[in-house]
Design a protein with these regions (language model features):
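Extracellular structured ligand-interaction cores
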Residues: 25-29, 44-46, 61-63, 95-97, ...
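Serine/threonine-rich, low-complexity linker/repeat segments that form flexible spacers/stalks
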Residues: 1-41, 50, 150-155, 159-175
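Short acidic, glycine-rich loop/turn motifs
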Residues: 68-72, 157-159
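Extracellular adhesion/glycan-binding regions together with long Ser/Thr-
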Residues: 18-21, 70-139
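Serine/threonine-enriched low-complexity regions used as flexible
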Residues: 32, 45, 112-173
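Low-complexity, serine/threonine/proline/glycine-rich extracellular segments that form mucin-like
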Residues: 33-70
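Extracytoplasmic/secretory soluble proteins
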Residues: 51, 82-84, 101-112, 149, ...
Length: 175
């Protein structure tokens, strides 16, 4: 969550923190970062974020933005995925509020960050950043004095190179 006002306890210069102080009706921004693993053994690579928001938060589907940052020929580059390169599904099941899925992260990274190492394999490790917003709604007033409204996210990813990205997936722990 990005804190909406300066706070000496937040050491991150852009005010990103695990908690925030918002009022009903305000937009609450979220940001998650991860790194592209070595996916040379895959033909395709599935990558998805699963999010479970409190009922006091209303997800803004149109606010989703995904960027991949890395280097090309020694120069910094950030690529923003188009809306056709990922899908947002609300209430996909399993208690998730929504899911953001990139069907083939490998194809995008290989196209936009085409560096290879001395073995002629693609170089990975780029940073993937997903941002989106929610609005603190009137349900927040139903339980005043509580410590806050939880928002949990986990990453789902291909984890079987032999299945061509269509098979088994793994998950990170909820955070």
């Amino acid at each position: 969550i990005q804190e909406d006002d300066a706070n000496a306890n937040i050491t991150d210069g852009d005010r990103w923190n695990d908690i925030g102080d918002y009022e009903i009706g305000q937009t609450v921004p979220y940001k998650y970062t991860s790194n592209v693993p070595d996916i040379n053994g895959y033909d395709t690579y599935y990558y998805a974020w699963h999010d479970v928001m409190s009922d006091a938060l209303t997800f803004n589907k149109n606010s989703v933005k995904i960027e991949i940052s890395g280097t090309v020929d020694g120069k910094a580059k950030t690529y923003t995925l188009s809306n056709t390169e990922f899908a947002v599904k609300e209430k996909p099941g399993n208690g998730d509020t929504f899911m953001i899925a990139v069907a083939d992260l490998k194809a995008i990274v290989d196209r936009e960050f085409d560096a290879v190492d001395n073995r002629k394999e693609n170089t990975y490790g780029q940073t993937v950043t997903v941002t989106y917003n929610a609005t603190l709604n009137d349900k927040a007033a139903e339980n005043t004095g509580r410590p806050g409204f939880e928002n949990d996210v986990r990453l789902e990813f291909s984890n079987d190179a032999d299945s061509e990205g269509e098979g088994k997936t793994g998950y990170t722990p909820w955070d």
